[in-house]
Structures are given as C-alpha cells and as structure tokens.
Regions:
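Transmembrane alpha-helix boundary and packing residues in multipass membrane permease domains
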Residues: 27, 31, 43, 80, ...
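Transmembrane helical elements of multi-pass membrane transporters/channels
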Residues: 22-41, 143, 154, 177, ...
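Small-residue-rich hydrophobic transmembrane alpha-helices
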Residues: 54-114, 118, 151-170, 277-340, ...
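Short runs within selected transmembrane alpha-helices of multi-pass transporters and secretion channels
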Residues: 75, 144-162, 170-178, 199-214, ...
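Small-residue hotspots at the loop-to-helix junctions and early N-terminal turns
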Residues: 49-62, 137, 141, 200, ...
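Helix-terminus/linker motif at the lipid-water interface of multi-pass membrane proteins
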Residues: 36-55, 124-131, 187-194, 253-286, ...
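Residue-level signal for short hydrophobic patches within transmembrane helices
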Residues: 13, 17-36, 40, 63-70, ...
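Short alpha-helical transmembrane segments in multi-pass integral membrane proteins
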Residues: 1-24, 82-149, 191-246, 302-367, ...
Length: 449
C-alpha cells in the first residue's frame, strides 16, 4: 500500500522523467516476460516437433492473441478510470470501478470460452491453415480457450494495480506464469512430445498459477480500497468501463483480425511461409516492447494527472516518452532490416522458415521507426479518454490500407514474403499521420501548443 501511495505521489508531482521511467521499466519487463511466455511455446515446439506443429502454435497463438485483445482492451478502461479516481483522491470510486470490473469480466470470460471452443474449426479453415497443421491448431486453440477465465482474471488484477500507479506487482505475477510455462513446455513438449497440445496445456496451467499467486498476494498486501457489497450494486461503473474500454477492445481485436487476414493470404504460399509470418508476429511483440510499455505507462500517467487537474504535466509526459521511444525504434529498424535471419533462427531450424521470416522482417522493418511515436501518442489519447479516435484510426489503417494492400501485393507476379510485408509500414504511415493531425487538434482545443 505504501508502494502504491509513493508511486501515486511521484506521478502527480516533481520531475517527470525519473518517475516515468521507474513506472515504465516494470511494464517493459512484464511485456518481455509475456513475449517470452508466448515465444517459449513456439521455440520449444520448433526445436522438438515438426514444422506442422510450429505452424499450428504460430497460427493458434495469433488467434488467441486476437481473442485476448478484447480483454486487454477492456482492461485499459479499468486502468484509465482507476487512475483518474486515484488522481482525484477518490479511492471509494476506485473500489466501485474494481467491483464493476469483476462483474463485467466474469461474463466476458464465460462468453469467450464458449465462442472460441465452438468456432475454432471454422476460424482455422477461414485462415487457410495448412491441412497437415489443421488438427493441431484446433486442439491448441480449444485448450487455450479453457483457460480464458485465468486470462481475464490476470488482466483485470493487473489493470487495477497499474491504475493505482503500481507496475511492479503485475511484473511479479507474469514472472510466476513465465517460470511455470517454461518448465511445463520443456516437460510436455520436450520430454513427453505432446506437440501443440502440450504447449497449450503449459500455457493454461501457467496462467492459473499466476492468478492464484496474485490473489494470495492481495490478501497479504491489501489494496488501498475496500470491495464492499455496496460496491457491487453500482451498475454505472460497468457501463463506464465498457464505454471507455470497448473502443480499445474492438480496435485491438479487429486489428489482430486484420493481421490474421494477412496470415491467411500468406498461408496460401506454403507451410514454411505460414510458420515464418507466425514467427514474425511473435518477434514484433518482443521488438515493440519499449513503445508498448510507454503507451501503457502514459495511459496511467495521463489519467492520474487529468484527474488531478494537471493537463500540462500530462502533455509533458507524452513528449518525453515519445523522444525516448523513437531513439530505440531506430535501433530496432536496423536490427530487423539486417539481422532478420539471426532473429528467426532463435525459433526455428528449418532454413526455408528462416528465409521466409527474414524476408518479411526486412520488408516491414520501417514500421519500427514509426510505431514508437504512434504508440506513445495513443497512450496519451487513452489517458485523455479519447478512445473512440484510437479505435477509428486503428480500424481505418488496418482495413482500408493494410489488408487490401497485402492482398493486392500478393497478386503481383512473383509475389513473396518481402513484397507482401510492405503493406505493414505503409499502413503505419497512415497511422502516424492520423495521430499527429488529431494530436494537434486536441492540443489546440486544450491550450496553446
């Protein structure tokens, strides 16, 4: 509780750079561990199983990421509202928001479990999953769907902590999950050769352990508010969470669907290309950790400062985060352009898969120069409760640029992974332009910039 109070005070007063970095670093480590969490499945299966199993885990994990994005999007609504309540010093309201989240997320977990289990085969066929990987992909998705309750619980608890200004506790929760997942992956896939199903079972078990640990953690270190019965009787908080989180959830989900559509286009090229684009998407999660962490940090920073009536401080935090992220983005651009093959070799031994992955990374490398500014600006918009714009720009760039352009490029004579991947940085340019234009408009409406 004292850790939460200290972090809250740093966010609202004093220098910005130091507390912003202190808050962001645990988020970076959390994202790194989450990326490792998913990548370990792919790496272990790639080393101990067939290429078909690798394609199954790559495609199946992409589908589950799309579903999970609905939960993480709603979680952002919780983080923003808790942050704003804490910034205003209203911890009772923060408790009501947490109670509303529990009600909403319980319903979401049940609904998603049923839908994913039933429609897994249809989704796999729609994505043109190679025939020799179809059965394993369906099994992977259905097993992971059985752990949806743990996914929603973990995200919900972590969202509350981040809204309070505490990014260290969620890091501890995901560390537990990562350790359990690595151990079980090596056991179930490496020793018992359970292929994609073993990787899925390891994932679900790790998530369950993480949630159990987080509940025990809260019992020993209570939150700075009480979840009283009266808190659960307030319906307005559920609607507010949905109003703020639903646009982000819908945007994240449909943008993930757009990448699945691109995967569907690539899957027609063969199993090696199918595995290659799956590995490329896994690498994106690793390589975008810094801007994604700043995006999450800014959502809390901005929400708390707006709740405290300090819009100028919120604006300064955006400018600082954007500068830091862009510097790192330049380094990632060079790495993906020149070292894609080395990155791919971490996950796969097959030379054809490595070549396909390297080609896709080279073509999409320019994206890593642009996403730092995009993600930081979106985090600022989230904290300002401008989530409808976040949704609109994301959907426009995905479905008006990225998907149709990928399809058109795939129809070109001799089209390969390099050619198709060019749609990604082109859509990122559209993203950035939209964000900068809206940011300028928002800045002028608040105060002279």
């Amino acid at each position: 509780m004292s850790q939460t109070t200290s972090a809250h005070n740093e966010i609202l007063q004093g220098p910005i750079l130091s507390p912003l970095i202190r808050f962001t670093l645990p988020l970076m480590l959390s994202l790194l561990l989450q990326a490792l969490y998913g990548a370990v499945d792919l790496a272990v299966v790639g080393k101990f199983s067939s290429t078909a199993s690798t394609a199954a885990v790559a495609t199946g994990s992409q589908m589950m990421q799309s579903v999970t994005s609905l939960v993480t999007g709603l979680t952002m609504g919780v983080t923003i509202l808790v942050g704003k309540a804490v910034g205003a010093g209203d911890f009772q309201q923060a408790g009501r928001i947490a109670a509303g989240q529990i009600k909403l997320f319980s319903a979401v977990a049940i609904l998603l479990t049923g839908l994913v289990t039933v429609f897994a085969p249809l989704c796999c066929r729609w994505m043109n999953v190679p025939a020799n990987a179809l059965a394993q992909t369906i099994a992977y998705i259905r097993i992971c769907a059985g752990g949806m309750v743990f996914i929603t619980a973990y995200n919900g608890i972590s969202g509350i902590f981040r809204g309070l200004g505490n990014s260290k506790s969620p890091l501890l929760f995901v560390l537990i999950a990562c350790i359990v997942n690595v151990f079980l992956d090596l056991l179930l896939v490496g020793v018992f050769h359970m292929d994609a199903a073993g990787a899925a079972l390891a994932t679900v078990a790790a998530q369950a352990c993480s949630v159990l640990f987080s509940v025990l953690y809260i019992r020993r270190r209570p939150l700075p508010f009480v979840l009283a019965r009266e808190s659960f009787r307030t319906r307005g908080c559920v609607l507010r969470i949905a109003a703020l989180g639903a646009p982000i959830a819908l945007q994240d989900f449909l943008v993930n669907i757009s990448f699945l559509m691109i995967t569907s286009v690539v899957n027609r090229l063969g199993v090696a290309e199918s595995a290659g684009i799956g590995i490329s998407e896994k690498l994106f999660v690793f390589l975008s950790i810094i801007p994604m962490a700043f995006m999450s940090a800014l959502s809390t920073f901005v929400a708390q400062n707006m709740g405290a009536g300090q819009p100028e401080r919120a604006r300064k935090s955006l400018l600082i985060a954007r500068r830091i992220s862009v510097v790192f983005g330049a380094g990632i651009f060079l790495l993906t352009f020149f070292g894609g093959g080395l990155l791919a070799a971490i996950f796969e031994n097959d030379p054809a898969v490595i070549a396909a992955t390297a080609a896709y990374l080279r073509g999409s490398s320019l994206e890593y120069l642009l996403t730092p500014a995009i993600f930081c600006t979106l985090g600022y918009f989230n904290g300002m409760e401008r989530t409808p714009f976040v949704m609109i720009q994301g959907l426009a760039s995905a479905f008006l640029v990225r998907v149709p352009l990928s399809y058109l490029l795939s129809l070109m004579p001799g089209a390969d992974m390099l050619v198709i991947s060019l749609a990604v940085p082109i859509s990122a340019v559209v993203n950035l332009l939209a964000c900068l234009i809206y940011d300028r408009h928002l800045c002028r409406s608040l105060s002279p910039c």
